[in-house]
Amino acid sequence: MMNVYITKAAKFLPNDPVGNDEMEQYLGMIDGRPSKARRIVLRSNGIRQRYYALNRQGEVTHTNVQMAALAIRGLLDEHLQLDDIDLLACGTASPEQLVPSHGVMVHGELGGQRNMEVVSFAGSCCTGGDALKYASMNVRLGYAKNAVASASERISAWMRASYFQQESEQLAQLEQHPMLAFQKEFLRWMLSDGAYALLLQGSPGESGVSLRIEWIDITSFANTTETCMYAGAEKDSQGHLHGWASFPEQEWLTQSLFAVKQDTRLLSEHIIGLGIDYLLELSAKYHFSSDDVDWFLPHLSSMFFKDKILEESRRRGFFIPEERWFVNLPLVGNIASASGFAMIEELMYSGRLEKGQKILMMIPESARFSYCYCMMTVC
């Protein structure tokens, strides 16, 4: 089998960054009143700015599809034209239609003269990793001479005030128990829009940094866990999920069915422990230790989890010190499926990488507890 390399990365982040005090100018106010919980949640998640495909009037400036296409076009140059691309793999947690798939909509937006293989991955944060794995396997097996993996989100569409019913904000409980903030309010002040694209080829780029993909492993713990994060559905007292089509149309808004929701009890109970369980399994499978990792790229939904990961990984015997971490969440926000690509893109062009260094990327997905790990070598 061939080696496969990430030879180029590109991004599209819409409009100007939005600071913490500007958010409700874009998203609107629930019940016409400023959120009293916003500052508490932001203090916990550590995000200082994010990007929205919205203007201050709440009007959409870019679609998910348009942003993905713009990021992909950022890969093109004199060495790669649109019609040179063999395969397109797209991941998103926020598709804008049920049918056609997000991927073929991106292909249609790109245009060009040549047909190509296109695949889409639906779900949540791991869909970017899914797209990267599918693209890398096709290049590695010789089915494609190159491939593009994209990950993009327009989650601001789900964060607007019109998607939320009036709900009380239990400020005292939020202060005393930060985990309670990981509900609708937390997610509303965390998520960000944007798109990233990676070019994969069978040999390193002629100049600059390339990253050889050593392996990508993905797993799901849905067989033993309940749904934790969901949208377009409601969860009953027995832990069963009921999709939007099970409800009368008049309840879609009154029950905030299309707001992104999180079961904070399950998140606290499982998200870190299961991720480390899987990491230890992979360290045995691929024969590596924490000492072999020069750069650790963890997709964090919130900086709230940083110290908890450090503490638990030390206790479990796979400790990567913070000075070897690379995280850009505070400046780009949580872009869900694109967050892993965002770290790769920024680190790739940072001037900080040295040949031979090992990069371990971790993407946890709380929806029903899936995890993606990817090991890369700097070339």
Language-model segments: residues:
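Condensing-enzyme catalytic core mediating Claisen C-C bond formation in acyl metabolism
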Residues: 1-61, 177-269, 364, 374-379
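Short acidic, glycine/serine/threonine-rich loops at helix termini
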Residues: 18, 99-101, 132-133, 158-163, ...
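Claisen-condensing/thiolase-fold acyl-transfer catalytic domains that form or cleave C-C bonds
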Residues: 65, 69, 94-96, 108, ...
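Short glycine-rich phosphate-binding loop at a beta-alpha junction
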Residues: 83-91, 290-299
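Short, flexible helix-coil linker/hinge segments at the edges of structured domains or between repeats
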Residues: 156-182
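Acyl-CoA/ACP chain-elongation machinery
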Residues: 143-165, 221-229, 303
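Short beta-strand segments
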Residues: 7, 91, 122, 147-153, ...
